Amino acid sequence: MTDKETQNENAPKKLSLQRRVKTTVAGGKVQVEVRKSRKIDTEAAKKAAEEAKLKAQEAAEKAAAEKAEKEAAEKAKKNAEKARVAAAVKKPEPVKVVDAEKDRIKAEEAELRRKADELARQKAEEQARKAAEEAKRLAELAADRETTEVSDDFSDYHLTSTYAREAEDEEERRKEGRGRGKNKVGKAKKGGRDDNGSKDERNADRRNQKDVKGKGKQGKKGSSAIQQAFTKPAQAVNRDVVIGETITVAELANKMAVKATEIIKTMMKMGEMVTINQVIDQETAQLVAEEMGHKVILRKENELEESVLEDRDVNAEKVTRAPVVTIMGHVDHGKTSLLDYIRKAKVAAGEAGGITQHIGAYHVETNGKMITFLDTPGHAAFTSMRARGAKATDIVVLVVAADDGVMPQTIEAIQHARAASVPLVVAVNKIDKPEANPDRVEQELLQYDVVSEKFGGDTQFVYVSAKKGTGVDELLDAILLQSEVLELTAVKEGMATGVVIESYLDKGRGPVATILVQSGTLNRGDILLCGFEYGRVRAMRDELGKDVESAGPSIPVEVLGLSGVPAAGDEATVVRDEKKAREVALYRQGKFREVKLARQQKAKLENMFSNMAEGDVAELNVIVKADVQGSVEAIVQSLQELSTEEVKVKVVGSGVGGITETDATLAAASNAIIVGFNVRADASARRIIETENIDLRYYSIIYELLNEIKAAMSGMLQPEFKQEIIGLAEVRDVFRSPKFGAIAGCMVTEGVIKRNNPIRVLRDNVVIFEGELESLRRFKDDVNEVRNGMECGIGVKNYNDVKVGDQIEVFEVVEIKRSI
């Protein structure tokens, strides 16, 4: 393989840089501009030139060596000639002939060596010349491969004239042609590294110009394989960043399309230390995003909720609606009996223990007009239910028993009505009783700013008897009169809104909610959003259990079809889109869960040290199940209020509906008692309760439930111990005994001195020793007790400093049971 072939094989196959080809259309005429695009095999030419230079250097070195050798040979020849001449002078003639022959032979050998060296030098020069010609040929071959291409990239178009471009091309050709000559070896010798260096610089400049100009498709075609480095964008891309109420650092980085470390660095500069998963608020996120040059769009998390709730029917006509009346008052003052008489139905007799357990909603017609009544419980435990009743109502009828007067729940009902800005109508009940005193009721209510019309106020007082029906018509007239003054109106046609009065879980029908419609008309098939729950209305029933297709303003109905049991007091709203209703319900559940977890975390942190300080506090774990949501709330609240510093009631679970297997398992795991209020346990739950020996209790009256829980808590209290003095003896004399030490001769002045009880020694009414007796004798006999007025000898254990005049006090420790 020849040197030429080796060079061709080692040369890069396709390393080329292209120059520009342009086509422009300007000024209404077609002007085709074609610039030659020159591809130069840069690396191959450069490598060939370097090899040629190296060979030329080698040839020069060889030539220098040959020259030195030649000079040495000539010098040796001259010396030999001198020696020969000298020898010819000294020696005789025959010897001269021999020496001349030897010198001739040596000269011929030197000449042969010189010729061989000359041939080698010529051969080296020929090889160097061929290498230079090969490099020139490669460069010319690259120049011959010039092509023309048409560019469609309008951004690369420049407005230089044709003459200017031709002049530019001519200048480039002239510069490139400077280094090209016939004698490449000589040029390599003379130019050295400087010429190549300047050529490399020119090539690099040309590549840079092409890289700057080469963009888009043309740039991709014209770029060399060597120039593949990634060029970072000179300017960051600014984006519109949508930020919710809270956002993590990682999410913010993702939205801004930057690394999370950049955000952390920025926040460190702003004086805030954060981690990648840390949640930051909307304001902080806005500052960070704006600091990094992005535009911020703030978004409310509940935007969907607001849009769903605002999507209502507008411009609907308002009509007069029936008043919603809530009956309030103290327990057993006759609220339900009064309502029962109004409804002409015997509902009140079914209430356990005379206490209204649920909030009931009924509507009645009188004198052609309709009134909706809400009945609230009067017991102290049902504060939250009364507050809900006042919120949903237009008029409050305050029932006060004429024989009882104003009681605590009466005052509370007045406060609820005031808080809700609802007018009062006072019904003084039980006026048929002999001990009734209606005037006293009016006087007592004056101190709570409830002034009757008789005293110049604006509150109507009506005297009624729920048993006999006395004054009931007057009460209804007073309610209708008050409603006319209020001018109650509501939109009848359109999407309904209302409030959940009560809710419970029915085993056969699922979640059931009693909803009081406040505006619009609720139809069967409507999509309803209630707090955390949603669903399509599958069925509606009135208070008598009859199916109804629709319910207008001020009408209470039972609704079936919700996804779960809503909380009493939740707002019920009809929406258009079931999918959006589901999203809103899930969003509300998530928010509630976050708030609950945050509250629990806060409570854990706050209680950590206090719990450590308190030590072990006795806990009574309770699981509460009731038939309706209102009862669950009332019982849980009442139980939590029973907690003391020593015994805490912990409600580990509560819910609406029967006692299930899950409840029983939870009770077994947490060692809790199960309380069922108007509900029962199913068969599977009963099996677990019997197996695990769980305490299960059923109640229908809240008084009994609270009293029994109190008793259970009392049993968990630490008992108190009290010291009772049972006897006192006065020391009259002191005897010394070798066996017992000091023996005190005493006279019992009070009570009984007992042998086995603890004693105290008093001197000048100050306790100086507390211990026990070692011996108690009457004369020489050991006795167990000595009564008042008798003498005895007393030996005090581990104490010999008894003196005359001291008193010995005997006491016993009595355990006292505590109660809550």
Swiss-Prot record:
Task: Specify the protein name.
Answer: Translation initiation factor IF-2
InterPro entries hit by this protein: EF-G-like_DII, EFTu-like_2, IF2_II, IF2_N, P-loop_NTPase, Small_GTP-bd, T_Tr_GTP-bd_dom, TF_IF2_bacterial-like
- Pfam families the UniProt entry points to: EF-G_D2 (PF22042), GTP_EFTU (PF00009), GTP_EFTU_D2 (PF03144), IF-2 (PF11987), IF2_N (PF04760)
* Segments of skewed composition (Basic and acidic residues): 113-148, 191-214
Q: Write out the entry's keywords from A to Z.
A: Cytoplasm, GTP-binding, Initiation factor, Nucleotide-binding, Protein biosynthesis
Supply one GO CC term from the record: cytosol
Q: Region G5: start and end of each range?
A: 465-467
UniProt-annotated binding residues for GTP: 329-336, 375-379, 429-432
User: Region (G1) spans which residues?
Assistant: 329-336
Cited CDD domains = IF2_eIF5B (cd01887), IF2_mtIF2_II (cd03702), mtIF2_IVc (cd03692)
Extract the ranges annotated as region (Disordered). 1-21, 113-234
Q: Where is this region: G4?
A: 429-432
Source organism per entry reads: Mannheimia succiniciproducens (strain KCTC 0769BP / MBEL55E)
Q: Which HAMAP family match?
A: IF_2_B
